[in-house]
């Protein structure tokens, strides 16, 4: 379904701000009720040395099994369906083995999709396939990141009109100049923007900080900069701490489905227990064959449409 206000366009952003909000598509938070989600394909997935996680997996000679990955992926699809979420997918490209991680090639906003600028050469083609997908769905492009490399896992909407942006520099996935470009755009839209550098070891900010519900976040306190933690607490956001080892295994990289429901990997034991104690409904597929390649459920999705909050 194309957006009622805007047809597909390659630039929906107004240079001076006040860009119109899309009528049908878009998300102004990470915790409004998720209605439509964009996933990458599993058919072309294989492990590459893309991160500290996947390098360790390959170094330890763990055997990759595509059939197992497909079964686990389908379990995740079933979880989304059970939660009432409509699933959309990128068309698989055999030259893009990390296309499964749909978080990074684009960023969905209330104003349209941002096309990012992937850092690793074997992922750059994902940006082009993302444009095709948004064209097919009739979702306008807000703009393209051009000032440097930037990946979607470093764009973290904390609450409506407020975003946390991470960057890692030349050794990582997102550059400071690109983060600044985003900051300028969103400040013109009258958003609050908090930019922070993170160690390239952690790949993206969504490894360690993810919103679960209004005023509730999962955070790895062992690896998150204290300034970020203080900033969140000053916003009266309650923090559920995720242990370092579970964080490295993508246990903090989870998806809020809205209405106190969360999708997380089966291995995320601590967060699962804490959320159940808070009264949350949990969807917890086994995704170990996928996560050992360096990405979790949050990495694998892009929220195309959430109920506004």
Say what each PLM segment does.
Residues 1-309:
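The feature marks the mature, well-folded catalytic cores of soluble enzymes
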């Amino acid at each position: 379904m194309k957006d009622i206000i805007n047809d597909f366009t390659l630039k929906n952003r107004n240079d001076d701000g006040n860009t119109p909000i899309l009528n049908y598509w878009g998300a102004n938070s990470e915790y409004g009720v998720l209605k439509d989600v964009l996933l990458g394909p599993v058919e072309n997935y294989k492990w590459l040395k893309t991160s500290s996680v996947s390098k360790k997996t390959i170094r330890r000679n763990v055997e990759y099994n595509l059939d197992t990955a497909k079964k686990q992926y389908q379990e995740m699809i079933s979880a989304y369906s059970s939660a009432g979420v409509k699933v959309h997918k990128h068309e698989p490209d055999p030259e893009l083995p990390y296309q499964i991680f749909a978080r990074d090639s684009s960023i969905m906003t209330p104003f349209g999709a941002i096309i990012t600028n992937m850092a690793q050469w074997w992922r750059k083609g994902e940006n082009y396939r993302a444009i095709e997908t948004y064209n097919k769905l009739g979702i306008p492009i807000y703009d393209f990141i051009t000032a440097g490399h930037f990946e979607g896992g470093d764009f973290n909407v904390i609450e409506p009109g407020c975003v946390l942006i991470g960057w890692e520099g030349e050794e990582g996935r997102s550059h400071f100049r690109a983060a600044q470009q985003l900051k300028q755009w969103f400040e013109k839209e009258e958003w609050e923007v908090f930019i922070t550098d993170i160690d390239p070891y952690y790949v993206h900010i969504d490894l360690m900080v993810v919103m679960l519900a209004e005023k509730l976040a999962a955070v790895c306190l062992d690896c998150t900069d204290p300034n970020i933690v203080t900033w969140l607490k000053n916003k009266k956001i309650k923090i559920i701490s995720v242990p370092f080892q579970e964080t490295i295994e993508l246990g903090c990289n989870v998806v809020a489905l809205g209405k106190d429901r969360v999708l997380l990997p089966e291995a995320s034991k601590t967060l699962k227990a804490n959320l159940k104690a808070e009264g949350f409904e949990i969807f917890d597929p086994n995704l170990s064959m996928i996560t050992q390649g360096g990405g979790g459920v949050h990495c694998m999705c892009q929220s195309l449409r959430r109920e506004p909050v």
